[in-house]
Design a protein with these regions (language model features):
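Short, basic/aromatic recognition patches
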Residues: 1-6
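Alpha-helical substrate-recognition element adjacent to the catalytic core
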Residues: 7-109
Length: 109
């Protein structure tokens, strides 16, 4: 049975929480240019645009390799400050690069 199923957190006594941005994914230049310059403030619209191109992020492979090893012992729960609007793209990215197609446990802002 896959540890990525919806009851995984009930089958294992400990949970490892893994942040996404800057931990297992690196924002690309295509994404970073959407943010306003420092000191200019950021509107929700800016963050929505930024988060909606999260599927272009580059995987940080050495960290992902460690996270995959953690799956053997622990329930792994991903967290992010991304807006809810990017949930589907975030889940798709995790399935593609981290969970080998299985549905990830995910909490978003």
């Amino acid at each position: 049975m896959s540890i990525f199923n919806k009851h995984a957190h009930q089958e294992r006594p400990y949970i490892v929480i893994v942040d996404i941005d800057g931990t297992i994914s690196e924002a690309t230049e295509d994404r970073l240019h959407l943010l306003p310059p420092p000191g200019k403030g950021a509107l929700t619209k800016d963050w929505n645009e930024f988060n909606l191109v999260c599927d272009t992020d580059t995987p940080i492979t050495p960290v992902i390799d460690i996270v995959r090893q953690l799956f053997n012992v622990y329930t792994v729960w991903f967290v992010t400050g991304r807006c809810e609007i990017a949930r589907d793209k975030t889940r798709a990215w995790l399935r593609k690069y981290v969970t080998n197609g299985a549905e990830p446990l995910l909490s978003m802002r």
